[in-house]
Structure formats: C-alpha cells, structure tokens
C-alpha cells in the first residue's frame, strides 16, 4: 500500500520536511514587551516532540505597535531576539524538528485586550493602548479606534522593520519565514478594496493595492537567505 502524501517528505526550497504535517502559528499572549517567556519554552517544546514535519512560531510583530495585544510576541529589539534565542536553544538541545516563524504587523487591528483578561476589544490610549496605523483612516468596525492613515515614510519604515526582523531570524537559525497577510492585519488591509480607500499609488487598482505588500515581501526576501523558504499566508 502506498504511503499517503501526508506522510511523505516534501522539499520546500531546500528545506526537506519528513512529512507534510505543519503546526500552524498560534498566538499565546504570554510575551512581556514582545519577549518570549518560560511559557513559550513549554508550549513550543512539547510541540517539537509531536512528530510533525514543521513547527511555526506564533504571529511575531516586527515593531511594538504591530502587536495584536500587549501579550504578543515580537522581534523588533535585541531583547526580543535574546529571549527567543534562549527558547530555541532549550528546544534544540532535545529536538531536531524544523522551526519557522510567522512575521506580521496587526495594523488597524492592533492594541486589543489580551484574550482571557476579562475585557474585549481595543484598549484605550489612557489604559495602555497605542496608536494604530492602516492604509486609510477606517476602523475595523465602528467600535474600533480609527487608525492613522500611513504616509510613504510610514510604509518605508515598516518595510525596513520587516527586513530587520528577517535578519534576526537568520541569526536565530530559523528554517522558514511566513509573512502574515491575512485576517485583516496590515498587509491584508492594503489588499482589501474595503479597507484601502487610498487615492495614491498604493490604492485603487489591484496593482496599486499590492504595491506595499510586495515591497514587504521583496525586502524580506533580500534579507532572508535564498536557500531558505519564504511564504505568505
């Protein structure tokens, strides 16, 4: 009987997985100032022994204001990098599963309450929330704070932040990067004709709406080794 494709190896741009079971990134809301905690060692560590072909670390913000919540993981600072390196060191001491990471920016859906904290929705600025950004000054819903519409300087800065995070991923020895361009977060919102009402070269036509997301992809690809896979969700 032929082995089902699910259990056969697959080559992802040189990264050979022993099977096609991938553990998707799952937010844990357990970081402190973007830094991985002991919980991440336990959470990721036990998954690394599951027998899956690939483990992808949760949505990881490329800058502080790009976090979904204050408890989200980040990779914008040396402190973030050191904390995640310690988690990976502990895991790799005992497991050899390939490990990737999802890099993202929450955009207008950032600065929400930590799930399970007893409150829901956006956190007010005077209670620890922060300014959100997006392609246009349109809140995710009527209850959500209106984001500041990004100018080209903002976009250039975010592109650089993605590239810098990718460089940190190289130093961390990660095997794969997945860019988060779904769920209405920043890259996704630029693609949406509903969220993106811009009248410049970043809005309107599909070609224009893809301009910023493609700039992110290009910058990350340039910072990330060509023999390591890069994907987009």
Regions found by a protein language model. Give the residues of each.
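Alpha-helix-loop-beta-strand connector modules within alpha/beta enzyme cores
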Residues: 72-99, 193-230
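Glycine-rich, proline-tolerant flexible connector loops at the mouths of alpha/beta enzymes
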Residues: 56-81, 103-121, 178-204
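Short, acidic/polar
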Residues: 36-47, 157-167
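Non-globular sequence segments
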Residues: 104-168, 172
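Catalytic domains of carbohydrate-active enzymes, especially glycoside hydrolases
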Residues: 40-63, 171-176
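Conserved, mostly hydrophobic/aromatic
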Residues: 23, 47, 51, 91, ...
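Structural preference for beta-strand elements that scaffold enzyme active sites
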Residues: 20-22, 54, 96-102, 176-178, ...
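N-terminal amphipathic alpha-helix/helix-capping segment at the start of soluble metabolic enzymes
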Residues: 1-22, 91, 221
